[in-house]
A protein has these predicted regions:
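C-terminal accessory segments enriched in acidic
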Residues: 1-19, 23, 27-33, 84, ...
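Short beta-strand-to-loop junctions in surface cap/lid or active-site-entrance loops
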Residues: 46-55
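Short glycine/proline-enriched loop/turn "hinge" motifs that connect secondary-structure elements
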Residues: 50-51, 145-148, 249-255
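Conserved beta-strand elements of the Class I
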Residues: 56-59, 259
Length: 289
């Protein structure tokens, strides 16, 4: 996943989409590919379910446009899980993938914000809608620092959490196509947790605080457990109630553990991918322990 220069390789949106579709075709016996919805610039958002469990754990990345590495790594992770499931191989000689995912399946969403991802990779010309393209150009934001979606909205702060404050007309909670599609998906499934992956220089696991002492203790326990079994060093902390965040929305509405996991993705942080591949399996393994 890295070039000789040490710079991470970021696959195109099309490569991510068709890789997920291909996995759904190749491993159709135990996977299900679907399109969750469309972005504002009419890019389809791919989802791949792996396993035959009745309940689900969500693994999500690519919420902000600047997160250029994790979407490709989640595609790689999906392929690794599918191969291990089909062949009956354990991962790290411990995690029996088929057994775990037939108990609780994983729903992979590697790229929630394809428009922002494409802008950061290929510039404003990647936006097909001329109105959006011109509007965002006029804001004077660097393409490489652009975090929003095709309308310039930060999806990470667009979910209808408690005490959400609308700051501008048209920026009410849940206003964006990507947000609406994910909300519908989260509410359609019986799920047991949300693992939201983001890119940082140092690893950290944040758990969301919500109503109910028992729920909070359970979320804290799971976060501490995952931290204990991680490879790279980092910290664990309670996530401050963040207005409009996906993680806070899930904790409030679905009332299951909601974790934001910050993964180091630079080349010298090679343990980052190992954490990424083990944490979903360890989470499922630990749910009923």
């Amino acid at each position: 996943m890295y070039q000789k220069t040490g710079q991470p390789v970021s696959p195109s949106y099309e490569k991510i989409y068709f890789s997920m579709w291909e996995l759904g075709q190749r491993y159709g016996r135990f996977t299900k590919f679907r399109v969750m919805g469309e972005s504002h610039d009419q890019r389809m958002i791919p989802v791949l379910e792996i396993g035959e469990g009745e309940e689900t754990v969500f693994c999500i990345s690519g919420i902000r446009g600047t997160e250029a590495v994790l979407p490709g790594l989640l595609v790689k992770l999906s392929e690794e899980y599918c191969k291990a499931y089909e062949c009956g191989w354990p991962i790290e000689e411990f995690y029996e993938v088929k057994e775990l995912l037939d108990n609780i399946r994983i729903c992979m969403i590697p790229l929630l914000n394809p428009d922002g991802y494409e802008v950061c990779q290929n510039g404003w010309t990647s936006l097909r809608n001329p109105i959006y393209r011109q509007m965002l150009r006029m804001q004077g934001i660097s393409e490489k620092e652009f975090q929003g979606n095709g309308r310039g909205i930060d999806i990470k702060k667009n979910f209808p959490t408690l005490f959400y404050t609308r700051t501008r007309i048209g920026r009410e909670p849940g206003s964006e196509n990507e947000t609406k599609a994910l909300i519908h998906l989260l509410q359609d499934y019986r799920s047991r947790g949300l693992l939201s992956f983001s890119e940082k220089q140092k690893k950290a696991i944040h758990y969301c605080h919500t109503s109910g002492i028992i729920r909070n203790k359970r979320s804290c326990r799971l976060a501490r457990h995952l931290h204990k079994y991680s490879v790279s060093s980092g910290e664990i902390c309670k996530k401050e109630k963040e207005e409009g965040s996906l993680e806070q929305f899930y904790a409030e509405r679905i009332k299951e553990p909601s974790l934001e996991i910050e993964i180091p993705v630079t080349e010298e942080k090679e343990n980052g991918y190992r954490d990424l591949r083990l944490l979903p399996l360890e989470y499922i393994f630990s749910l009923d322990v």
